[in-house]
Amino acid sequence: MDLTEKLGEKAAISGEKKAFFLTTGAEAVENCIKIARAKTGRPGIISFVGGWHGRTLMCMSLTGKVLPYKKNFGPMPGPVFHALFPAEELNVTEAQALHSLEMIFQADIDPSEVAAMIIEPVQGEGGFHQVTPSFAKSLRDICDEHGIVLIFDEVQCGFARTGTLFATEQLGVEPDLMTSAKSLAGGYPISAVIGRADIMDAPQVGGLGGTYSGNPLACVAALAVMEVIEEENLLERSIEIGDKIEAFLKGLNLSSIGHIRHKGAMLAFELIDSDGKPDVEATTNLKAKSFEQGLLLASCGMYGNAIRVMVPLTVEDEVLQEGLDIIKGILTA
């Protein structure tokens, strides 16, 4: 109950709220879909190109990226439809993204048959592209107009990673349901669905659950993480880390570094070739050589040429600089 109350206080959803605990981010997403369908009595789900929601069959269906996550694993559950995600780097405007939603309603499914719309406030696997407040408001308006449940998936971007406890706080828009996992308990397995009470209560009694749902040790770990975030000022530290990494990368002044995107300490930078095109080979090389020197890096993005930087918010400056120096040494060799 302590964790439920704490999340209820912090979640960017007004009114009466409830929380439900599971083990993995994918479970949280799956249960959001179950809740939304129970509330609306509708089957359809809309997600976004580049979105990442997990590795279960439903979550793979929601995910807007085929390789390596969906190929050879079908058929996928449906009906699920993918709208465009607006991002300057992807040459997709907000108007184009909203038009793609309208086309889904015209060509694929009537909005009266859509149960939920799910989006990451900051895309993870998709390349750390950020939802703007204006686009979030447009989605909120569309969902309100058609009685669609709006879900914000904060499994990767939540819990201080972006400089606020939830990235949702920076959008000025409230979802109906939201997910949390990963950093929720500092890597200990626990996830959560947080949402409006009237929607959370929609499934029949016993319809939601799990063997390890809300296990005491995981809940205590999550409460401890929330204490550390407050006591060590990790929201401010997140912003400081992101700004420092961005300044470092820009200071290298390398033509091979393309777009740099960050919200707090959630940062990604693209590697490009001399023609300005995605350089997957250079990205793979950077990951491999960094690993040889003791630094783990992960790639992301629709073209696989972005490096995601997700350092612990408790990282010491000396350790952070050591990692940055490894990146510099490889990119400038």
List the model feature ranges, each with a label.
Residues 1-333:
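Conserved N-terminal phosphate-binding loop of PLP-dependent enzymes in the Aspartate aminotransferase
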